[in-house]
């Protein structure tokens, strides 16, 4: 678990950021995980991590929403060989990692928030052989 407290002082910019948290500095973040050893060298891993909302940038006041991601791995391992079937973002959580605020659409070029979304659910296999 992490706690972070940031505070901008003496900042001169287009908007007033005095006494505001810095960009990409969530106040709370956490990660918890566990491994379960099954029979015959099989195992299961689960980890959950998340963060509270944060400001996208020091050039505007838009913020992300808090989010939590779950990852799962089912694997097999022996002395020389490891194989994992993994799923990242198990519940296919829709979340934003970056935010940009500017005018990009003619004719009025009104400032609009554009978000970069985090990765969707990913499923993969990792195989390792030690020789």
Short names for language-model regions:
Residues 23, 35, 63, 74, ...:
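Residues embedded in well-ordered secondary-structure elements
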Residues 47, 57-59, 71, 84, ...:
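Acidic side chains
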Residues 1-58, 128-130:
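Gram-negative outer-membrane beta-barrel transporters
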Residues 26-30, 66-70, 77-79, 119-123:
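Residues that define the transmembrane beta-barrel architecture of outer-membrane proteins
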Residues 15-21, 57-61, 69, 110-115:
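Extracellular loop and loop/strand-boundary signature of outer-membrane beta-barrel proteins
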Residues 23, 68-70, 91-96:
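Generic, ordered loop/turn and secondary-structure boundary motif
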Residues 53-54, 76-131:
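C-terminal beta-signal and adjacent terminal beta-strands/loops
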């Amino acid at each position: 678990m992490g706690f972070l407290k940031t505070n901008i002082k003496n900042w001169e910019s287009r908007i007033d950021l005095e006494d505001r948290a810095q960009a990409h500095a969530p106040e709370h973040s956490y990660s918890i995980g566990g491994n379960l050893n099954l029979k015959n060298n099989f195992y299961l891993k689960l980890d959950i991590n998340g963060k509270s909302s944060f400001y996208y940038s020091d050039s505007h006041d838009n913020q992300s929403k808090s989010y939590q991601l779950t990852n799962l791995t089912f694997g097999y391992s022996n002395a020389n060989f490891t194989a994992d079937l993994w799923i990242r973002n198990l519940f296919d959580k829709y979340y934003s990692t970056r935010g940009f605020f500017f005018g990009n659409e003619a004719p009025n070029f009104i400032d609009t928030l554009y978000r970069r979304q985090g990765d969707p659910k990913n499923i993969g296999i990792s195989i390792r052989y030690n020789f």
